[in-house]
UniProtKB/Swiss-Prot annotation:
Pfam families reported in the protein's UniProt record: UPF0223
HAMAP family listed in its UniProt record: UPF0223
InterPro entries noted in UniProt: BH2638-like_sf, UPF0223
Highest taxon listed in the record's lineage: Bacteria
Name assigned to this protein: UPF0223 protein lp_2149
Lineage: Bacteria, Bacillati, Bacillota, Bacilli, Lactobacillales
Family to which this protein belongs: Belongs to the UPF0223 family.
């Protein structure tokens, strides 16, 4: 029996200085990553969520730190998921590592 990679009870890595709108954008992106790893998501929706995420987190160093924290908590890899999503030409996307 294959065990799930993620922990269902984890907190998203967030910055306490973000506004409510920014927290919603980042949380929506994390949920899109989860959808891509657990099932399927419209590729356009995932890419749009990433664009919104980047308006909140424009610095590459902060993005990498949040991605590390998110992977440690959830087991999902943002960089690999997004790289695969950006390379696909399919309307629906499902990440497989």
């Amino acid at each position: 029996m294959k065990m799930p990679k993620h922990n269902d009870n984890y907190q998203y890595p967030l910055d306490e200085t973000w506004t409510t709108a920014e927290i919603i954008k980042v949380t929506t992106f994390y949920q899109a990553i989860e959808a891509a790893n657990e099932g399927t998501i419209a590729t356009a929706d995932l890419l749009a969520a990433y664009r919104d995420f980047k308006t909140v987190v424009p610095a590459k160093s902060e993005e990498k730190r949040l991605a590390r924290d998110y992977e440690a908590a959830s087991g999902y890899r943002i960089y690999q998921t997004m790289r695969a999503a950006q390379e696909t030409n399919k309307q629906r996307f499902q990440y497989r590592d």
